[in-house]
């Protein structure tokens, strides 16, 4: 059986030894923690863990950048097209006015041709000659006849 008087001494001795051991362990841990080769090992470990995720994100970012560049090109092209169309409204208005004039002139020509056709059908014409030439020939003959009658 242990001696009751030696128990407090033993407890002090154990406490002092445990304190010394814990200080040495803490110092060893600090040294290991600050050792350069261990730090490099931890960096390599971190890099190996995080690099595949970074590479995947970079690939996704590159793909999204290409998609956004295409969308930006399409938007700029659309904006320039709409701006050009807005600037061309005066040209379109001018074309519409010219088309209206053409339709009006065509209607006038059709009306004149139908009027001439109906008037020529009603009046007598000399075959092979136009009405205007027949009228000129008639006038020439009538003036010759009137001058010969006067003489």
UniProtKB/Swiss-Prot annotation:
Keywords: Lysosome, Membrane
Top-level division of the source organism's lineage: Eukaryota
PANTHER family in alphabetical order: BLOC-1-RELATED COMPLEX SUBUNIT 8, MEF2B PROTEIN
Ranges of compositional bias, category Polar residues: 116-127
Annotated signal peptide: none
Function noted in UniProt: May participate in the coupling of lysosomes to microtubule plus-end-directed kinesin motor.
Subcellular location: Lysosome membrane
Name recorded for this polypeptide: BLOC-1-related complex subunit 8 homolog
Protein family (similarity comment): Belongs to the BORCS8 family.
Region (Disordered): 116-151
Predominant cellular place of this UniProt entry's protein: membrane
């Amino acid at each position: 059986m242990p001696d009751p008087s030696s128990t407090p001494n033993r407890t002090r001795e154990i406490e002092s030894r445990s304190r010394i051991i814990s200080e040495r362990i803490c110092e060893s841990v600090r040294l290991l923690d600050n050792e350069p080769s261990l730090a490099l090992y931890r960096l390599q470990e971190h890099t190996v863990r995080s690099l595949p995720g970074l590479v995947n994100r970079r690939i996704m970012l590159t793909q999204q950048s290409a998609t956004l560049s295409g969308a930006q090109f399409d938007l700029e092209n659309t904006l320039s097209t709409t701006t050009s169309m807005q600037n061309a409204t005066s040209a379109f208005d001018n074309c519409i006015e010219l088309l209206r004039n053409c339709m009006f002139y065509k209607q006038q020509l059709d009306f004149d041709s139908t009027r001439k056709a109906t008037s020529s059908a009603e009046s007598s014409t000399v075959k092979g000659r136009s009405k205007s030439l027949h009228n000129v020939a008639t006038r020439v003959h009538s003036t010759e006849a009137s001058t010969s009658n006067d003489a």
